[in-house]
Amino acid sequence: MGAMQTQALGMVPMVIEQSGRGERSYDIYSRLLKERVIFLVGPVNDYVANLVVAQLLFLESDNPDKDISFYINSPGGSVSAGMAIFDTMNFVKPDVSTLCTGMAASMGAFLLAAGAKGKRFSLPNSKVMIHQPSGGSQGQATEIEIQAREILKTREQLNKILAERTGQPLARIERDTERDYYMSADECKEYGLIDQVISKRA
């Protein structure tokens, strides 16, 4: 269940803080946002991307010099929504540190690799999966041809970025993303998608 669905059911824990002015309650995600922690949980779509982008921009305006932590547990989803997050991660001034909890697949893995170099992490039992973008089309033959060309261009764009982020040769990225390619946390580090596997907070 995604964070937003959980919130809709009223199951998000509340945190109560004491201050000189009395008590204040926050939902847990708002409290963690104060600590500069953003979550991507569940599928990547336009709604989720809009929330993540807004949080990145807010945290940049709050403190442009302090790192942002981005926790990812996602099966992937829309390429255009994912690219909106990717571009904003690079656009904002603070470094964005990424951490895989559970699974980062498809666009989730792409965003995991998009973290600041040296600040991309995974918990030890997490899984990561990369593959080529998929899409379906219908309509006239010419429309299907246009869509197919666009998917091929997108695949080329994503592969080039992955090669740059991992240090792997483009030919290997192209070969590995031809089908679903699963990695353990340690294999993910060896591949260059992350920089470190962590089991305890330093």
UniProtKB/Swiss-Prot annotation:
Protein localization: Cytoplasm
GO cellular component: cytoplasm; endopeptidase Clp complex
InterPro entries referenced in this protein's UniProt entry, alphabetically: ClpP, ClpP/crotonase-like_dom_sf, ClpP/TepA, ClpP_His_AS
Keyword Cytoplasm attributed: yes
Reactions that this protein is recorded to catalyse: Hydrolysis of proteins to small peptides in the presence of ATP and magnesium. alpha-casein is the usual test substrate. In the absence of ATP, only oligopeptides shorter than five residues are hydrolyzed (such as succinyl-Leu-Tyr-|-NHMec, and Leu-Tyr-Leu-|-Tyr-Trp, in which cleavage of the -Tyr-|-Leu- and -Tyr-|-Trp bonds also occurs)
Keywords: Cytoplasm, Hydrolase, Protease, Serine protease
Pfam families documented for this protein: CLP_protease
Superkingdom of source: Bacteria
Example GO BP: protein quality control for misfolded or incompletely synthesized proteins
Single Gene Ontology MF annotation: ATPase binding
Top-level EC class: hydrolase
Active site feature: S106 (nucleophile), H131
EC number: 3.4.21.92
Alphabetical list of PROSITE patterns matching this protein: CLP_PROTEASE_HIS
Function: Cleaves peptides in various proteins in a process that requires ATP hydrolysis. Has a chymotrypsin-like activity. Plays a major role in the degradation of misfolded proteins.
Record note on quaternary structure: Fourteen ClpP subunits assemble into 2 heptameric rings which stack back to back to give a disk-like structure with a central cavity, resembling the structure of eukaryotic proteasomes.
Family in the record: Belongs to the peptidase S14 family.
NCBIfam families membership: clpP, PRK00277.1, PRK12553.1
Name of the protein: ATP-dependent Clp protease proteolytic subunit
Name of encoding gene: clpP
